[in-house]
Amino acid sequence: MRITELRNRMSEAFADPDTYSRDTVHSELGGLTVNEALAAGQEPGDIWRGVVAHNPEMPAKLR
């Protein structure tokens, strides 16, 4: 997955994806936010899987 696809999926899943990516800390990402995980070099696909795991109520079509 490319960063662009991650950002597109974030936009589909969250009303304010920029704030979510900046402020929500995920234990699934080693205690990092989405933006921090990207800066640390984590793969976008792994980050997306962490976001999905952190949000079990996410509709199946977005998983």
Give residue ranges: language-model regions.
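C-terminal alpha-helical interaction appendages
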Residues: M1-R63
